Amino acid sequence: MNMPQSLGNQPLPPEPPSLGTPAEGPGTTSPPEHCWPVRPTLRNELDTFSVHFYIFFGPSVALPPERPAVFAMRLLPVLDSGGVLSLELQLNASSVRQENVTVFGCLTHEVPLSLGDAAVTCSKESLAGFLLSVSATTRVARLRIPFPQTGTWFLALRSLCGVGPRFVRCRNATAEVRMRTFLSPCVDDCGPYGQCKLLRTHNYLYAACECKAGWRGWGCTDSADALTYGFQLLSTLLLCLSNLMFLPPVVLAIRSRYVLEAAVYTFTMFFSTFYHACDQPGIVVFCIMDYDVLQFCDFLGSLMSVWVTVIAMARLQPVVKQVLYLLGAMLLSMALQLDRHGLWNLLGPSLFALGILATAWTVRSVRRRHCYPPTWRRWLFYLCPGSLIAGSAVLLYAFVETRDNYFYIHSIWHMLIAGSVGFLLPPRAKTDHGVPSGARARGCGYQLCINEQEELGLVGPGGATVSSICAS
């Protein structure tokens, strides 16, 4: 079975020569083979793929010159195979000031290498392991093994003196090494350009980095195809500032006395801006609150903006409209908790609201025996352009937007949706000017019928006239 590849922040040193035939030197002898004891480690499970291994009387290990130190770490099946096994050695330089000491570490799977004076190489016949070394010049060595094999891993530490490629057994120097071994889900938590995720494939659970902004690698550290800082800043500003297109619809809604609708548009503009400021990868990030809260509020505001606009176009009775607003907010919140990224979260409420709109307009057209809205200007200059803009936005969102073109296609989506609201939002409903309040309340058996243009907001309040008197 092939051994996994290792990841480290520095190249491994050249392997020292085999000490089966020790180099000539004063006081060097060839002692007989010994069976060195294996020191166990304590296992502390913190979370999924998060395990720390501790040694007794550690974390520092004293390495006498006459024998190596061997440690055993056991990785459990399924529970440990989906993470990253990390090993870190740090030499205490003050413990070896008098001699030029190099500490070698050999990490092998299932079979420990008998170091002693026989060999320090990390390979023997069909067995191959991972070699590390620390010295006065290179005090820290790190090794990372993604998706390690389960079973027992053995770490053998041995101190030698001299300068490579020739090493000899030390005389009196006892090297002190700080050892840190742990299992983590991802390499360095994927850094600033990635996110560590738990994945499952065919009942196999494992962790991996999802890199962003063009970064790649096990820990999202490969910048060969990474986006520049200027490009990241441009995409963030474009996604955030495109939400300012909601300002004209907010002003228009307030002037038309659609205060509740204006509040929804303001809510959407605010949370969409800060959600995209927090959603960006890399260092161009600004979060005012938890990411999950910002995402939920952004999605809810977007769907509610579509909902309240279409319901307002239906011109329903105030009580019915308020009930639909509240019911829509509750149902949309439930749908977003089930699946925030589902396409039907947008199409479902939109189609349902369009059904209510079509029903209301059909009933009104049948009662009045002519098309509603009755004026061609309303259709030509408002409804048709607004519908085309909104339809284009939905098509871009559903079929064109990808991960690569997200920053500019989604910015266009912001501007199109906000622009369509300005066309589709109906004009203000006119009041009966000049009619006494008592007459409005009782009517004296009659009902005042206001000109159709006045209802559609195509004439000013000064031009309001009574076109007919109808029996109530």
Curated annotation (Swiss-Prot):
<feature type="topological domain" description="Extracellular">
    <location>
        <begin position="278"/>
        <end position="292"/>
    </location>
</feature>
<keyword id="KW-0496">Mitochondrion</keyword>
<dbReference type="GO" id="GO:0007346">
    <property type="term" value="P:regulation of mitotic cell cycle"/>
</dbReference>
<keyword id="KW-1015">Disulfide bond</keyword>
<comment type="subunit">
    <text>Isoform 2 (via its cytoplasmic part) interacts with EZR.</text>
</comment>
<dbReference type="GO" id="GO:0007160">
    <property type="term" value="P:cell-matrix adhesion"/>
</dbReference>
<feature type="domain" description="EGF-like">
    <location>
        <begin position="182"/>
        <end position="221"/>
    </location>
</feature>
<protein>
    <recommendedName>
        <fullName>Transmembrane protein 8B</fullName>
    </recommendedName>
</protein>
<feature type="transmembrane region" description="Helical">
    <location>
        <begin position="380"/>
        <end position="400"/>
    </location>
</feature>
<keyword id="KW-0130">Cell adhesion</keyword>
<feature type="topological domain" description="Extracellular">
    <location>
        <begin position="337"/>
        <end position="342"/>
    </location>
</feature>
<keyword id="KW-0963">Cytoplasm</keyword>
<dbReference type="GO" id="GO:0005783">
    <property type="term" value="C:endoplasmic reticulum"/>
</dbReference>
<keyword id="KW-0256">Endoplasmic reticulum</keyword>
<feature type="region of interest" description="Disordered">
    <location>
        <begin position="1"/>
        <end position="36"/>
    </location>
</feature>
<keyword id="KW-0245">EGF-like domain</keyword>
<feature type="transmembrane region" description="Helical">
    <location>
        <begin position="343"/>
        <end position="363"/>
    </location>
</feature>
<keyword id="KW-0341">Growth regulation</keyword>
<feature type="transmembrane region" description="Helical">
    <location>
        <begin position="316"/>
        <end position="336"/>
    </location>
</feature>
<feature type="disulfide bond">
    <location>
        <begin position="190"/>
        <end position="209"/>
    </location>
</feature>
<keyword id="KW-1133">Transmembrane helix</keyword>
<dbReference type="Pfam" id="PF12036">
    <property type="entry name" value="DUF3522"/>
</dbReference>
<feature type="transmembrane region" description="Helical">
    <location>
        <begin position="234"/>
        <end position="254"/>
    </location>
</feature>
<keyword id="KW-0325">Glycoprotein</keyword>
<dbReference type="GO" id="GO:0005634">
    <property type="term" value="C:nucleus"/>
</dbReference>
<feature type="glycosylation site" description="N-linked (GlcNAc...) asparagine">
    <location>
        <position position="100"/>
    </location>
</feature>
<feature type="topological domain" description="Extracellular">
    <location>
        <begin position="401"/>
        <end position="405"/>
    </location>
</feature>
<feature type="topological domain" description="Cytoplasmic">
    <location>
        <begin position="314"/>
        <end position="315"/>
    </location>
</feature>
<keyword id="KW-0812">Transmembrane</keyword>
<comment type="similarity">
    <text>Belongs to the TMEM8 family.</text>
</comment>
<dbReference type="GO" id="GO:0009986">
    <property type="term" value="C:cell surface"/>
</dbReference>
<dbReference type="GO" id="GO:0005739">
    <property type="term" value="C:mitochondrion"/>
</dbReference>
<dbReference type="InterPro" id="IPR021910">
    <property type="entry name" value="NGX6/PGAP6/MYMK"/>
</dbReference>
<keyword id="KW-1003">Cell membrane</keyword>
<feature type="topological domain" description="Cytoplasmic">
    <location>
        <begin position="364"/>
        <end position="379"/>
    </location>
</feature>
<feature type="transmembrane region" description="Helical">
    <location>
        <begin position="258"/>
        <end position="277"/>
    </location>
</feature>
<dbReference type="InterPro" id="IPR000742">
    <property type="entry name" value="EGF-like_dom"/>
</dbReference>
<feature type="disulfide bond">
    <location>
        <begin position="186"/>
        <end position="196"/>
    </location>
</feature>
<keyword id="KW-0472">Membrane</keyword>
<keyword id="KW-0539">Nucleus</keyword>
<feature type="topological domain" description="Extracellular">
    <location>
        <begin position="1"/>
        <end position="233"/>
    </location>
</feature>
<feature type="topological domain" description="Cytoplasmic">
    <location>
        <begin position="255"/>
        <end position="257"/>
    </location>
</feature>
